[in-house]
Amino acid sequence: LQDFSLSVNAGECVVLHGENGIGKSTVIETAARLLPLESGSVSHHGKVVCDGEGRRNNPAKPFGLTLQANCLVSSQTVQQQLGNVVAICGKSFDCKGVIDSYNIGNRRNDKIAHLSGGQQRKVAVLSGLIPGMVDEESTLILLDEPDSGLDDAAVEQLVNHIHMLRNLGHAIVIATHDKRLLECATALHDLSKSTEQEPTNNEIWQVNTTDND
């Protein structure tokens, strides 16, 4: 991506859309510090977490992340996987209710490796959402095509959770083609047009780059 700037504030849901290969996943992965910058910077809560000079700093607080790849530990159970997310956030939270809400309550104690692809995707989505569910303070949540592989009921539940988290003041960035998720947006960003959004004093996340690998 070149000459790209984007910010998301507390209580906002920015949805990235556009044709395949336009850079939606690049934005998400750069925001998560998974891709290097040739120039520019990424900030969380006003603190630069990486830049084109190679500097890297830990974010001020944990953030939620669901990538296109599920990135789960196959030897862990569903409960262990989500419990680890809660522990990273330094919070206490009973995951039973949210596990049940995605109709995988009966698989709670099963290993990730034994789940179907759709069930694994539900766990990956919950892993990205839980940091917002456990924290009263505004949290950044990054979701890369979270609807991929989900059944209709799960997508409906995902939409409900996104609305809930946004109303609680969390900052959400979603890359998607799904029209149901587009309706969650407080701002749409078409990467094929790549219009710049000016940051405000309440910004939770900002990325500015003139080039990206």
Located regions from the model:
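Q-loop/switch helix immediately C-terminal to the Walker
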Residues: A69, S74-G90
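Conserved beta-strand
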Residues: L1-N9, G40
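Helix-to-loop junction immediately C-terminal to a conserved catalytic motif
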Residues: A32
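Conserved ABC ATPase signature
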Residues: K111-G118
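Walker B catalytic motif
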Residues: E145-P146
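Conserved ABC transporter NBD signature motif
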Residues: G40-G52, N57-P59
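The feature captures the beta-strand-to-loop junction immediately N-terminal to the Walker
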Residues: H17-E19
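Conserved ABC ATPase "signature" region
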Residues: S92-R107
